[in-house]
Amino acid sequence: MTAPNNAKTNDHVLAVVIGRAGSKGLPRKNALDIAGVPMIAHTIRFARASRRIERVIVSTDGDEIARIARSEGVDVHMRPEQLSNDSATVDSAVRHAVDASASPAGIIVILYGNVPVRPADLADRAIARLVETGADSVQSYYRVGKTHPFWMSRLDESGKVTQFGENRIYRRQELPPLFMPDGGVIAVRRASLFDVCEGEPHKFFGSDRRGIETREGDVIDIDTALDMAVAEAILVARTEVHA
């Protein structure tokens, strides 16, 4: 399916939740229970609570994840084998899901299923910036603090230390602002998503890329057991506040 001719003015919004079955670090990661809810269900509920997302679908290669998604009331599109291995790209899986859904939406919101903690308005902020600026894509970023590269060093096999950057001491307020993608949300124009170019893995972001800022810790991307523990604590605390 190709992008509609009016892709820049078509502001209908489709969210694609990505959830692979395989995970080397945490087996069944996207289906694991966290704060009483399957991991991927947190993202589905986040998307369904958005004021601007009109439809939510899930792309997966796992039957367990598919069952969870359907129990949350969303459509599921099973990935073919070639889009389910470690070398498959996120954008290729999203294109497959968009095509399979037959959605005419001009804006696609990409959400990772292993991110159970996000600010409630994050997707709406990204969509608003995309629409207001006419950009090709908007991604969420946090400002790098203690892991700023100007404070980093190299450590070789003998234990010898060399500074990564310029050999000087930086105070925190002297560090140039740098930002890291946090995995919270990507909003992209359909035309950009389907503009594929071999050898350019970031081509689908388009030429006009924008960002929205989050605070470090606002978004929790689950890769390890420690990430799970942090996210669980945050989600339980939120539940207690609203109880």
Task: Specify the residue positions occupied by each region the protein language model found.
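N-terminal nucleotide-binding beta1-loop-alpha1 segment
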Residues: 1-27
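A short, N-terminal amphipathic alpha-helix
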Residues: 39-55
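Short active-site oxyanion
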Residues: 52-57, 217-219
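Short, high-confidence coil segments that cap the C-terminus of an alpha-helix
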Residues: 53, 103-105, 134-135
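Short phosphate-binding loop-to-helix
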Residues: 63-109, 117-125
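A generic structural signal for short hydrophobic patches within well-formed alpha-helices
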Residues: 66, 193-194, 228
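Conserved core of the sugar-phosphate nucleotidyltransferase
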Residues: 92, 96, 116-205, 213
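Catalytic donor-sugar/metal-binding loop of nucleotide-sugar-dependent glycosyltransferases
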Residues: 199-220, 225-229, 233-238
